[in-house]
Amino acid sequence: NYISILELNNLISGSLVIISVMVLSSLIDLPANLIKIFNIDEKFGFNRMSIKVFILDGVKQLILSILIGLPILLFSLWIIGNLGELWWLWLWVFISFFNFAMLSLYPLYIAPLFNKFEPLSDIKLKAKIEKLLLRCGFKSSGLFVMNGSLRSNHGNAYFTGFGKSKRIVFFDTLLEKLNSKEIEAVLAHELGHFHHEHVKKN
């Protein structure tokens, strides 16, 4: 019983140290984030985020950190304290499995908590993009438009997910500003990451 209590205390104390560092880091970064969004980006016409959205994002991130991050942290500390000299190998296996799982789950369950995603409705643009994807050998489960304008005036496109959840996402601001040729060029840049397997290497 004493050993069990000691192990539990080590897990709790280890978690509290790491959480304290993360909280302190977030508090230090907070003023810089506020200045960047509501001063610099606002000055140059890029910011569309309200204080309400900023606070809601922070609350959602905190809840996700508790629901997902805390169990991962506790289990990682348990591995370090209980699996001997090869703890680093088991920790690597666990973190790798978790990362692959998140690649599949993020676009389906986490990203929609922060943004709305709708299928690309422009039939002509969709046909051109699908033709480009076919040439590059990129298999996607869908083309989606994200309401990036909720937070920023910047335009972007990215691919996310793994396996059946792999998809391509366009910011609505990108579709508003660029023509089809320019959109294909932006997507070609993202496909370059796919071709060189940057996601797998990271």
What do the PLM-derived regions correspond to, one by one?
Residues N1-N202:
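Polar-ligand-bearing catalytic/cofactor-coordination segments
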